[in-house]
Amino acid sequence: MKKIRRVLALVLVVSSLLAVASVGVLADAIPGQRLAVFDDIGQMNSSTFTDVSSKTWCYSGVKTAYNKGIMLGYTDKTFRPNNNVSWAEAITIAARIHAAYNDNLIAEPSQNEAWFMTYYRYCSERGMLPSATPAVGKLSQSINRYNLAYLFAKTIDDQDMPKICDYAIGDLSSIPGYYKASVEKLYAAGVMIGVDSSYRFCGTSTTSRGQIATVISR
């Protein structure tokens, strides 16, 4: 039962990460419900981040995502909610989800290396990284939804994402072949339903840290 609940929670987290443009459809969700099966590993308070206060639009989302260890801040005590999600951040989140799903441990970072390198190695060793992944020195660049889909389609096994949905992808014909299977897998599993009433994927779009924190915590 615990395994099933964890799988469902992880599917919902992935769903949220890839559906940030459809926040309205989750307006009635209970804050923190999606991540309730995960233990808190942190405790955000008023002094945790200098740029997120109780009046910030994404405060509750940031607090839940931080407390669950899904998203953390920067060394200068900022969260930077309006920044686009970077490759390094997406890879880190994917590694954490995959490790939680598989009961794996992620190695401690080596001394004097970039903070994301242990997560990069974790994903690289498991064949999770898309071919478009930039060089390590450029992982601070923003990641688009095509590459998010590819990356997060690798986090949960196919048998735990059965086909339960028949939504037609509004812009399927424009999705590059390399990403099509990942997008179709996530649509079929009901993990994502697109960003508008036509269920378009809009793969070249990016998303912000505040948006992701808000939706994954619902």
Predicted regions and their residues:
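Non-catalytic cell-wall polysaccharide-engagement segments
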Residues: 209-211, 215-216
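Phosphate/pyrophosphate-binding loop motifs in nucleotide- or prenyl diphosphate-using proteins
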Residues: 69, 190
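Mature N-terminal segment immediately following signal peptide/propeptide cleavage
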Residues: 63-68
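Feature responds to low-complexity, polar/acidic, surface-exposed segments characteristic
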Residues: 4-12, 18-59, 72-146, 154-181, ...
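Extracellular C-type lectin-like domains
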Residues: 183-186
